């Protein structure tokens, strides 16, 4: 850790003094052959593989400077496919050197280098993304997921068409290498990265089939891939049109992102980032002035542009050509869905999002008369996908296919308080997350399933009946928590089903809502 701290301090010092030393050309290769970096990487690999950890005192017996240089030279000179075949053959062999078994073969070195590459990328990218983090801190950004809906209600309701676009993830490995060559210009490091990305072809695919050992690298490459896409897109807009950013980049779930970028602590399971980027600006091509609104959530983004449907179709072809030219990959047209805001609905962050007309009556008082008129405006309509929620509860073994509650047999080994807290936590998070929906009363069907599933789980554990469980626990099953009292204090005179609640302290997605995406 001393080496990492020294390198980061040195890089910051060079940036402050504005010297002519290109730090990305000097430090990346040096980090690959640092003993402390190797010790951290080997300890990570040993923790995952169940092997014994390596101390710094015993490090020279395992990894010498000459061995590292020789291995990196072999990677640079040989074909990576031949190297991978050799590592597979060497994995099954054991060499003996005296009385000690020589178990750390090429495969062991390869996995260690993979961990080292992840560490180096975290160090280098953390320094490069510090200006971006400072920009987020200067902006009036919100950490809440629900802050996106007031923004969409203010701006998207005036747009006739929306483009719902899914970002392609099947990128050629050499495209990823080209991205990093722009930032890290030393030759040995991209060769080491090339060896890894060629072994795992779909390394940035958004799928749970990715091995757990490369999830951290997959997350890092995905975030950098999205960063390159958005920075290229915005810079192109600024060069082509007079693009002036009005409200730039509201970053949600900022705490988790900073922990991931600055490498504050090691996370055992890293999931895909749930950043939501909001970008709006004015575009002035020739003499016609219009506005563009861009919202990205996970692997999807929505573009709203004023004008006719013909204009949004031109933007569709623009994104197809943009992806082919800058990323050298075929952007399949079915990934772009053109939706009318007044008719079509789209899935969005576990909700069903749409717009509906709303009639507002206005009274205008004249001198001796009272005129009553009305006008129609669009209103954001957020609906809970109840049927999808029931399907997910069925998948999680809370109910059967017909929606009847069943016992959660996997939780019967827990304590009674733990079972009650688990069910109460699920219901509390669902209530918070869907508090701004119009059909919030449909959540009582979900509450019914969870309530009886909790009772049946306790009855199955104690080998009794539900009647005995009701009599024993009573109101402890789903007690009236503080989030009920909060609504009663604010809406004491108004029925809370008629008002939408957006909780601006909700900074992470619940796992069921994440599955609905």
Curated annotation (Swiss-Prot):
Keywords: Chloroplast, mRNA processing, Plastid, RNA-binding, tRNA processing. The keyword Secreted does not apply. It is found in: Plastid, Chloroplast. GO terms for cellular component: chloroplast. It comes from the Eukaryota. GO terms for biological process: mRNA processing; RNA splicing; tRNA processing. GO terms for molecular function: RNA binding. InterPro entries: Domain_X (IPR024937), Maturase_MatK (IPR002866), Maturase_MatK_N (IPR024942). Belongs to the intron maturase 2 family. MatK subfamily. Usually encoded in the trnK tRNA gene intron. Probably assists in splicing its own and other chloroplast group II introns. This is Maturase K. It comes from Palhinhaea cernua (Nodding clubmoss).
């Amino acid at each position: 850790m001393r080496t990492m701290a020294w390198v980061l301090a040195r890089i910051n010092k060079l940036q402050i003094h504005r010297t002519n030393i290109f730090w990305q050309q000097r430090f990346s290769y040096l980090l690959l052959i640092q003993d402390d970096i190797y010790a951290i990487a080997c300890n990570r690999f040993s923790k995952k593989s169940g092997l014994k950890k390596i101390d710094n005192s015993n490090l020279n017996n395992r990894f010498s400077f000459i061995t590292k240089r020789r291995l990196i030279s072999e990677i640079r000179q040989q074909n990576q496919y031949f190297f991978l075949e050799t590592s597979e053959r060497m994995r099954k062999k054991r060499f003996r050197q005296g009385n000690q078994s020589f178990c750390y073969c090429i495969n062991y070195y390869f996995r260690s280098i993979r961990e080292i590459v992840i560490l180096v990328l975290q160090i280098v990218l953390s320094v490069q993304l510090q200006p971006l983090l400072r920009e987020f801190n200067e902006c009036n950004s919100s950490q809440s997921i629900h802050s996106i809906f007031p923004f969409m209600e203010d701006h998207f309701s005036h747009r006739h068409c929306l483009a719902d676009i899914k970002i392609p993830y099947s990128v050629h490995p050499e495209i990823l290498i080209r991205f990093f060559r722009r930032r890290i210009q030393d030759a040995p490091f991209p060769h080491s990265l090339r060896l890894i990305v060629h072994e795992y072809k779909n390394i940035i695919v958004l799928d749970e089939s990715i091995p757990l050992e490369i999830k951290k690298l997959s997350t890092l490459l995905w975030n950098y891939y999205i960063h390159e896409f958005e920075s290229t897109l915005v810079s192109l807009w600024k060069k082509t049109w007079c693009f002036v950013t009005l409200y730039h980049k509201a970053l949600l779930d900022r705490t988790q992102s900073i922990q991931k970028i600055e490498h504050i602590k090691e996370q055992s399971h890293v999931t895909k980032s749930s950043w939501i980027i909001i970008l709006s600006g004015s575009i002035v091509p020739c003499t016609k002035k219009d506005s563009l609104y861009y919202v990205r959530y996970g692997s999807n983004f929505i573009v709203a542009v004023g004008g006719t449907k013909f204009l949004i179709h031109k933007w569709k072809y623009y994104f197809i050509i943009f992806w082919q030219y800058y990323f050298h990959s075929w952007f399949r047209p079915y990934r772009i869905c053109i939706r009318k805001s007044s008719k079509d609905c789209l899935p969005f962050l576990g909700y069903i999002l749409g717009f509906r007309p709303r009639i507002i009556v206005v009274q205008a008082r004249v001198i001796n008369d009272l005129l009553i008129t009305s006008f129609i405006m669009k209103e954001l309509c957020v609906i809970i996908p109840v049927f999808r929620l029931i399907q997910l509860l069925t998948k999680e073994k809370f109910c059967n296919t017909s929606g009847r509650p069943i016992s959660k047999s996997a939780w019967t080994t827990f304590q009674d308080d733990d079972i009650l807290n688990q069910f109460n936590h699920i219901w509390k998070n669902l209530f918070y997350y869907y508090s701004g929906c119009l059909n919030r009363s449909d959540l009582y069907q979900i509450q019914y399933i969870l309530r009886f599933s909790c009772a049946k789980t306790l009855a199955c554990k104690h080998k009794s009946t539900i009647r005995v469980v009701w009599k024993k626990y009573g109101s402890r099953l789903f007690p009236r928590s503080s989030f009920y009292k909060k609504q009663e204090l604010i809406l004491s005179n108004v029925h809370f089903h008629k008002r939408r609640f957006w909780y601006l302290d909700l900074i992470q997605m619940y796992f069921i809502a994440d599955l609905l995406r």
